[in-house]
């Protein structure tokens, strides 16, 4: 029941509705929780040690001279945002295996520190004992830039003679473009509205900014050129085409270059309205700032924190954010989620055996079936065509929403019902 996110009260309700006697009192339930915590921690630590060894083995296939210098991504997740969260979980995941190498579960009533400060402390701790715990150094850190985690790691100087290098999560770098454009639109009048910086246009520019980085993450110059190509592309018109920086050839994403390669420029017409000059002038500094070499150098390699975020979601499925909880429950959820994340549902059978529970053939068949389905979903997510399809469907939804907002009066928004 704990794995299902159901606690003592839920267990009592289930027994009552199923006409079963309540076979546990509160104190016995607490004792059992401690046993589950101890066993889940033991199993999780075994799997994390295995993951570290797999990550080191994967390092032997690279040109890195020291297999003990690992590249990892780190992220933190908290039961509640801001100053009210008492519990949080931070994770470190290996770049090559995509498996969790370490987790740190924090318990603090945030009267003085925000969740961000707890994340910094948790990450610094995991870096500080990586050598004694695993015999490795986290030499390259993939972070989101949303907190002061990296500066905290640098200040703590965990490895003395080894500097920890920062790599940016491309997903979070991409979000900066959307955030900057929305802030600009909000602060500067006249940039929004039809034919200008609508929500759809901002989303498009943000997505293409991210794609420019992802598709050219092996070169700073190529990234910078690709980013500025998207800027000039959306400022082009039939009268003033400006596609010199767009990739050439029939395979180009730029319809103008595609038409030129096929010798069809005489009949070509832009299928979109160019951004007005005042909008282009306003957003150009943002493009220049977000294509600076210092930032793009940290994007070399095309890293992300997607695995950390998937782990975060798994933790709160086991320990829902909507339900009051305790430190023990959060710990159990984190360790169990870590086991499932690294080894699949089969890891739960290992945990049950550690608790002294016998697993029958139905349990094994269920674990095999669920793990097979999990692998199928993972393969589907990794498919580039599927990802492009999701982006296309998202833009179609934005089109529908904008059409509805244009054609109807505003029915929902801040201040709409102030007259009542």
Language model segments and positions:
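Extended, non-catalytic structural segments that build the interaction scaffolds
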Residues: 1, 284-300
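Amphipathic alpha-helical/coiled-coil segments positioned at domain termini
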Residues: 294-392, 396
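Amphipathic, non-membrane alpha-helical segments in soluble helical-bundle scaffolds
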Residues: 1, 276, 301-305
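Alpha-helical transmembrane segments that form the membrane-embedded catalytic/substrate-binding core
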Residues: 143, 147, 172, 306-313
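General secondary-structure edge motif
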Residues: 9, 110, 291-295, 314
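Short amphipathic alpha-helical segments, especially helix-boundary/capping motifs
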Residues: 125-129, 286-292, 308-313
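Active-site rim beta-loop-alpha module in soluble metabolic enzymes
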Residues: 280
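RNase H-like nuclease fold core
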Residues: 1-13, 17-140, 147-273, 285, ...
């Amino acid at each position: 029941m704990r794995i299902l996110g159901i606690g003592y009260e839920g267990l009592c309700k289930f027994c009552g509705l199923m006409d079963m006697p309540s076979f546990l009192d509160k104190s016995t339930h607490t004792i059992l929780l401690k046993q589950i915590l101890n066993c889940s921690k033991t199993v999780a630590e075994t799997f994390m040690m295995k993951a570290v060894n797999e990550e080191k083995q994967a390092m032997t296939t690279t040109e890195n001279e020291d297999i003990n210098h690992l590249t990892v991504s780190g992220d933190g997740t908290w039961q509640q945002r801001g100053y009210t969260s008492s519990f949080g979980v931070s994770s470190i995941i290996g770049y090559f295996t995509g498996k969790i190498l370490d987790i740190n579960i924090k318990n603090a009533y945030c009267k003085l520190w925000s969740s961000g400060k707890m994340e910094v402390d948790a990450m610094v701790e995991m870096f500080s004992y990586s050598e004694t715990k695993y015999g490795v150094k986290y030499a390259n850190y993939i972070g989101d830039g949303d907190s002061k985690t990296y500066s905290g790691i640098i200040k703590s100087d965990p490895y003395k003679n080894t500097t920890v290098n920062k790599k940016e999560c491309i997903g979070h770098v991409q979000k900066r473009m959307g955030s900057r454009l929305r802030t600009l639109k909000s602060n500067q009048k006249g940039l929004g509205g039809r034919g200008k910086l609508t929500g759809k246009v901002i989303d498009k520019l943000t997505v293409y900014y991210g794609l420019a980085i992802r598709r050219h993450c092996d070169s700073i110059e190529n990234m910078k050129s690709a980013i500025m190509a998207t800027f000039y592309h959306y400022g082009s018109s039939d009268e003033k085409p400006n596609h010199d920086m767009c990739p050439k050839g029939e395979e180009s994403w730029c319809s103008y270059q595609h038409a030129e390669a096929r010798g069809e420029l005489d009949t070509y017409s832009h299928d979109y309205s160019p951004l007005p000059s005042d909008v282009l002038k306003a957003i150009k500094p943002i493009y220049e700032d977000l294509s600076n070499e210092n930032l793009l150098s940290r994007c070399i390699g095309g890293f992300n924190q997607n695995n950390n975020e998937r782990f975060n979601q798994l933790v709160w499925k086991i320990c829902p954010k909507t339900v009051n909880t305790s430190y023990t429950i959060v710990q159990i959820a984190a360790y169990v989620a870590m086991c499932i994340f690294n080894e699949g549902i089969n890891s739960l059978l290992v945990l049950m055996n550690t608790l002294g529970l016998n697993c029958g053939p139905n349990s094994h068949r269920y674990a095999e079936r669920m793990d097979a389905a999990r692998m199928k979903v993972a393969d589907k997510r990794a498919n580039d065509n599927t990802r492009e399809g999701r982006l296309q469907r998202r833009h179609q939804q934005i089109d529908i929403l904008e059409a509805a907002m244009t054609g109807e009066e505003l029915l929902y928004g801040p201040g709409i019902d102030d007259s009542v």
